[in-house]
Amino acid sequence: MLEEKFIFYLKLKYNYYNIMENSYSYKYSEINSDFIINTVERKIKILTAKCTCDKIGVMIIGIAGNNGSTLTAGILGYQKKLNWEDKNGIHEIDFLGSLYQYGSTNVAFYKDGKPYSKLLRNIMNMKKIDDLIIGGWDIISSNLYQSCKNNKILDIDLLKKLKKDLENIQPLPGVFYKDFIASNQTSKVNNTKINKNNKWNDVLSVINDIENFKKRNNLKNIIVIWSGSTEKMNCCDKFEKYEDLISTIKNDIDNIIPPSIIYAVGAIMTKSIFVNTSPQNTIVSSLHDFAKEYDTFIVGNDLKTGQTKLKSVLSDYLASSGIKPLSIVSYNHLGNNDGLNLKESNQFRSKEITKIGVIDDIIDENKELFKDEKPDHEIVIKYVQAVGDSKRAIDEYYSELFLKGKNILSIYNLCEDTLLAVPILLDIIMFTELFSRITFELENKEIVSFSTNLSLLSFFFKSPETGKNKEYIYNAFFKQRYALDNFIKICSGIPVNDFINLQYRI
């Protein structure tokens, strides 16, 4: 009965125009140059368009890679309600590791204080996995069945059941400039666009691919996801205006424009949302102005999956307990193509930057603990072909205690790299689609959208995009999660939970 009442409550919140409208008053503190803290109150209306029956298109750059092919296979298998059998029995596709699929949050309390929780996707009217249509590009020509077979992620029984569907998915030719990925990747390249020495034609080709995909599948909205190999860092942040960036693409004499920016520009010009799930600095500041011009979003960077996600928990735990981390050393080795690409220094540097930055906000928030110091923070990644996708991660947290005592946490983490990443890709798709339907009415009646970087999605990224205004981003795991949970609550008129719960403490 309580479940039925809750569902009925949510249905009542949509108006005649299928807009969920909720007024919200929020307070925050600001400190001025005289170190005086002032409380500021703002009142807004949050407007959420109801989820329609339209399908959502997802176009993956690097669809034949481990993440792209496995996500596609998982979605197809889920849509077909397939199961598979191995020595442990019969299994169904469940997307364990997905916040969208399994994340719940407290929405109310019983009289005895026991929490009543709901799945996040049931609080807001979110898209279903059945609503997704997948396509994309790759610089390798193999159909997705052959790619999945080569990648060795799926159980063979499940792969056989998906064979016909996966064989029908052929990657579109991809944008390839050999200077931006590791030299050990070039021998496999056999499916590229043929616009020699003209990068603007590559942009136009990407636009054409997106529009054709929309037309062929009767789609209105597309999310474009970079899931390709890590590129070396680019120097395109020097362009303060997007007009200068576009001009350089049209006349790239110095070869400074990487493939990922070509896709980002093409996505923006079709009003598609662009997501960068790799470490490189694709989303340069001028692209935010460009995305705003086209009323779309540009989101990233680098999926936060295993070792780094755990670091965002443990480093916060130590500092929040008054324990001072002196050094954090992270070593890992893996044998998939991601590891192979990261063997070269330019590509590794992109990854190192995103992994190291994950503790910055924790240091900033604990000045008394760290003073002017920072923990020694080292990252090591090695390619070991024999272990394949079964990544080994070893972390040591060396910390200082009372009376100069020392504490060491040593963690050995063995995980399937792709099977951690794919459910997070699903999360990004689903929450990005939801947030694209939300606008805000300010006190002056102006209607605005989220900032172009969609920073509430920082929960899913190692190096969350700060946007044009260089928004301060929290990396600490539970701060990010509470922000996501509480925002979804206020959209549907449910009070946020600050865990003070004075009604039970007084």
Residue map of PLM features:
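Glycine-rich beta-alpha junction loops
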Residues: 64, 140, 305-306, 330-337, ...
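Short glycine/serine/threonine/alanine-rich loop segments
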Residues: 272, 296, 323
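Conserved anion/nucleotide-ligand pocket segment
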Residues: 299-371
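Glycine-rich, aromatic-lined ligand/substrate-binding cores of catalytic
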Residues: 352-452
